[in-house]
Amino acid sequence: MAKLQITLTRSVIGRPETQRKTVEALGLKKTNSSVVVEDNPAIRGQINKVKHLLTIEEEK
């Protein structure tokens, strides 16, 4: 299964609590922090909720 590298490029300051919790659930804490996660429908749904705050790259 493919992996995704997710980077938090925008701050969560001033964002609704649901978006903050979603970013935290993805494993991101600070701006410019990155995580590598499995590509599955649950992760894609979380990414879709906060896509305006993230940069997503597909790993090989």
From Swiss-Prot:
GO BP annotations listed: translation
Nucleotide-binding in keyword set: no
Sorted UniProt keywords: Ribonucleoprotein, Ribosomal protein
Pfam families from the UniProt entry: Ribosomal_L30 (PF00327)
InterPro entries, per database record: Ribo_uL30_ferredoxin-like_sf, Ribosomal_uL30_bac-type, Ribosomal_uL30_ferredoxin-like
GO cellular component, as recorded: cytosolic large ribosomal subunit
SUPFAM superfamilies in the cross-refs: Ribosomal protein L30p/L7e
GO molecular function, one term: structural constituent of ribosome
Source taxon at top rank: Bacteria
PANTHER family attached to this UniProt entry: LARGE RIBOSOMAL SUBUNIT PROTEIN UL30M, MITOCHONDRIAL RIBOSOMAL PROTEIN L30
Similarity remark: Belongs to the universal ribosomal protein uL30 family.
Subunit-structure text: Part of the 50S ribosomal subunit.
Identification of the protein by name: Large ribosomal subunit protein uL30
